[in-house]
Amino acid sequence: DRFMKEVDSLDDHYFNTTILVLFLADTKEELSQIEEKLKNTASLKSLTLKSCFSMQKEALNSVLIYGIQEFKRVVNLSSSCLAMFMPFKTQELNDENGIYYGINQLSQNAIFADKKLLKNHNGMILGQSGSGKSVFSKSEMISLYLNNPADQILIVDPQSEYGPVVVKMHGTVICFDSKKEFYLNPMDVDFEGVDYAGLREIISEKADFILTLISSLLKRDMEAEEQGIVDRVIDKVYSANYSMRKRLNGENEKSVEYEVPEFMKMEVPELSLSENLSTEEQVRAYSPTLQDVYQGLLDEGTDLSDHLAAAMEIFVNGSLNLFNHRTNVDLSNRLVAFDIAGLKDNLRVTSMLIMMETLRGKIRKNAKLDRWTHLYIDEFHELLSVDQVANFVLKLWKEIRKMKGIITGITQNMSDLLNDENAGKLSAILSNTEYFALLSQSSVDKRKLMEFLPNISPAMFNFVDNAESGTGLLKMGSITVPFDMRMSKGSEIYEIVNTDGGGYGV
């Protein structure tokens, strides 16, 4: 009756089961020793092991992978009892077309995972200093590069960490400082195929960016009147630029609601249609710059607009005017690193914000081409240190999925990332994140992570408690597995990804 109830009511199943243990030895004496040890170990668990006298051949054939059961002695076990035996209780991660993430510490099987299969593709790579976080990140980038030939990988590199890997993979490293003439224009915009509604969306996004930029410089939220001035200036700048580009391409200017300002009409004869510029060349040659916004604020002629213009001056006439030039770098390479280590520390966050606005445009362009973009941001916690910038990051974190983009934040300063001031925004970021690579964590950081990631069991979190370098937990959606991504010190890939002389080779 009990068995019938378990089957009918509890949906249990029973199986005819044979459990055989195969062990080998070089000598008969060693064989006897192993047999005795196994029997003693089993007896501690109230199990009895018996030798297969006169049935060695049948037992051996049953153990082998032929799927033949010649050993006919069976016992009836329920599915719940069978679940206690390995490997049935071991979680595996083996996505089709996934990239390699090391060895599962429990089953010793390889881990293959694909972020594109997740509902929310964004991720975080977290680990304290010396945990192997940098090597893990570089290994992931290399696997992505080799396994996804159509995708583009973009890296924001505040510490000159990724240059050697990018160069080895024939990628492009762009170093930004006042001594080098590498320029990115955050105001670049592609108007190809953009109608009036699309123009309004672009104006809204660029106004949001400039508002965030000025707020980060002022270290405060902007007043409603200030926001109105900036919004009006951005509207004028991009509406005029849109109308001018329409004329350059021989399109009917009446299709938009804006006329070309007189000062821009003066330039039209120099920009003849005979130049036959490509879309990319038009974007670089004719997009507005921060100078246009700065001049627009001055043209407003009020004390408040002059104050806002003064806040922007460092990016126009000051030490960070490298962002006030037309783009002159090639962003077409599949692997591009933006090295901003040469920028001043007190302006690094603002510089990262400008770079992210530029990269958002690149991601949107890739999306039009049905191309995936992977954006890695090292020292990610710095972007959350300024409230206005954190809001911008949160918005991009949410919307990038629609543009076939994947953001991966990399950070080691967990205490900064998880402080009370950032808690609200971090919760919003984590709720839109399904990929986590957790390497070694301090006890304090582990407790905070357990609060933010309640779906990972305390037992699993033991794998990151002061773990060995190169080991930790990988969470992909609902699946969490402990990984071991240590590699041989003699391998070529180890020489490429290891930059600190220690690494986590074995």
List each model region and its residues:
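Conserved lysine of the Walker
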Residues: 133
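Conserved H-loop
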Residues: 157-158, 378, 402-405, 410-419, ...
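Hydrophobic positions on the alpha1 helix immediately C-terminal to the Walker A/P-loop
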Residues: 136
